[in-house]
Design a protein with these regions (language model features):
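N-terminal alpha/beta PP-like core and its mobile active-site loop of ThDP/TPP-dependent enzymes
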Residues: 1-329, 364, 368-371, 444, ...
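Phosphate/pyrophosphate-binding active-site segments
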Residues: 132, 285-381, 501-512, 516-546
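A general structural motif
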Residues: 46, 106-107, 176-188, 248-252, ...
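Active-site diphosphate/adenylate-binding microenvironment
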Residues: 4-7, 12, 27-35, 338-412, ...
Length: 546
């Protein structure tokens, strides 16, 4: 068969359902093979958005998301999405085209060494140099992308190789088994937890697997340990649980850090140092048990005292089975901290001033979203408010990036979420800056006939940087911009545009749009003056003597 046919057959064998991308001239043989396959092509308006969609597909399903681009400028547009996937531990395969490698009459036109360009942001990057190697390369790329820690891989398919006749056949897919934990480490962890006075559980993104969610819920029910999570660990355990303290949206000086500072043992499950630190460790403070699929990456703010490496769910199940509550456990202080956190989150959540303040916005979104509804956040200061104040009830219902923390990923991620879960409510929440970085995908969403709501928070500036600029004592400079008429902008794509002009419209507008088919964009003017007042002044003035 033709090499491009073989490539697509290999992807089918691996269970690939969608390919997101923007094909070019060098992909035409591959595109023809794709036309005759069961795999559905999701044509996007920019390769970066295709990569974000594919990475999010990987995050939500555990399967490898696949995206396609041409050579040169198409492949370079993948780069940010590849880094997003690699740092965020989302399985992603990027396929790029290339000019003929055996005989080309176009000189160096559009040619870059894409394989080497991808090396720093991938786990695996290869060029196909003969068609019969395709089954090996595809199988290895998929395996590497999915194995812990998941991430990005890349294969380059040159134009002339795609036309070769091949005799090779796809490999049979073998499901790998994750390594089991060392029982001696499990026993040592049980002893450390039992002998601690104020053990505290931290849940990170690595725990966001179905089996691990169940295991952690059982662990918490049996022990009654209080827990908190990182931003990317939101929803692993239902945050309505009475033992939930909060999310580490800030690295220091939040109410949550009072509990962290008082803990004498932190059981760190699935956290990855690639996330912005949920706390800063110092020598002589609480001991840390690191439970993950891989060994801890030590740095000056994170170092573990015991490591349990292997399948996280199995590790937690073994601990739960043998652990009995410690005689010296005292969670009184944690209970008081939880009360303070809950009060602070509730404060101003009903304050219907205009423009809308973040606390009210978060509260209203939580009110209208169903338990399994998904919010996809872009990057901006509002992400801190949602991470901190929005309670997630189920795994992967708050999609955010706290690793690369790139702008422009929120809306494409929401599109991918709606493709994966067509019957669930999905809400993209973007700042005006982040939305405009990939707003062209409005056309993609409309063309796919999705039912999706986009909340655009308008402050006409790069608000996060503006806040930091003011905090450093600098004058305002270089961060303000204009915006289109978002209602007309949405309508120009065939979507429905809405604008909140007084705060009491927000709840009804959100509910109506979530229940009405089609693509809806809601423009919401926001007041970020609360950033300085609450996240800096109030938290700096608080005391941990509760």
């Amino acid at each position: 068969m033709k090499a491009s046919d073989l490539f697509v057959r290999c992807l089918e064998e691996e269970g690939v359902v969608y390919i997101f991308g923007v094909p070019g001239e060098e992909n035409l043989d591959f595109l023809e093979s794709l036309r005759e396959s069961k795999i559905k092509l999701i044509l996007t308006r920019h390769e970066q958005a295709a990569g974000f969609m594919a990475a999010t597909y990987g995050r939500l399903t555990g399967k490898v998301g696949v995206c396609l681009s041409t050579l040169g400028p198409g492949a370079t547009n993948f780069f940010t999405a590849g880094a997003y996937s690699q740092l965020g531990a989302m399985p992603l395969l990027m396929i790029s085209g290339q000019k003929p490698i055996k005989k080309s009459k176009q000189g160096r036109f559009q040619i870059l060494d894409v394989v080497e360009m991808m090396r720093p942001i991938t786990k695996f990057t290869k060029q196909v140099v003969h068609g019969n190697s395709i089954p090996v390369l595809v199988r290895e790329a998929i395996r590497v992308a999915q194995e812990e820690r998941p991430g990005a891989v890349h294969i380059e398919l040159p134009e002339d190789i795609a036309t070769e006749e091949c005799s090779a056949q796809p490999f049979e897919v073998i499901s790998p088994r994750r390594p089991q934990p060392d029982e001696r480490a499990v026993t040592q962890a049980i002893d450390m937890i039992r002998s601690a006075t104020r053990p505290l559980l931290l849940i990170g993104a690595g725990a966001n697997r179905t089996s691990t969610c169940k295991a952690l819920s059982m662990f918490i029910e049996k022990t009654g340990l209080y827990f908190f999570n990182t931003q990317m660990g939101k929803g692993v355990v239902d945050e309505r649980h009475p033992c939930f303290l909060g999310t580490a949206a800030l690295s220091t000086k939040d109410y949550l850090h009072c509990a962290i500072d008082r803990a004498d043992l932190i059981i760190n499950v699935g956290h990855d140092v690639i996330e912005k630190p949920p706390f800063y460790m110092e020598q002589g403070t609480a001991k840390v048990i690191h439970v993950n699929h891989f060994f801890a990456q030590m740095d000056e703010v994170y170092f573990s005292h015991l490591e349990i490496v292997g399948d996280i769910a199995t590790s937690i199940e073994h601990i739960t089975e043998k652990l009995e509550p410690g005689k010296n456990w005292d969670f009184t202080y944690f209970h008081r901290v939880k009360h303070e956190i809950d009060e602070h989150v509730e404060d101003k959540s009903k304050e219907a001033s205009f423009p809308v303040i973040p606390q009210y916005l978060v509260d209203q979104v939580r009110v209208v979203m169903p338990d399994d509804g998904i919010i996809a956040l872009d990057n901006g200061v509002y992400k801190i408010w949602f991470a901190r104040n929005y309670k997630a009830y189920s795994p992967n219902t708050v999609l955010l990036d706290n690793a690369l923390a790139t702008m422009g990923a929120g809306f494409p991620s929401a599109i991918a979420a709606k493709i994966v879960y067509p019957l669930r409510k999905v809400l993209a929440i973007c700042g005006d800056g982040g939305f405009m970085m990939n707003s062209q995908e409005m056309e993609t969403a409309v063309r796919l006939k999705l039912n999706l709501v986009v909340l655009v928070l308008r402050d006409n500036a790069y608000g996060m940087i503006k806040w930091k600029q003011a905090g450093m004592g600098f004058q305002e400079f270089g961060l303000d911009y204009g915006n289109p008429d978002f209602m007309k902008y949405a309508e120009s794509y065939g979507a429905k545009g809405h604008r909140v002009e007084q705060t009491d419209q927000l709840n009804e507008m959100l509910q109506s749009c979530l229940e009405t088919p089609g693509i809806h964009l809601i423009e919401v003017p926001v007041d970020y003056s609360e950033n300085e007042q609450v996240l800096i002044q109030e938290l700096n003035a608080k005391t941990c003597v509760l």
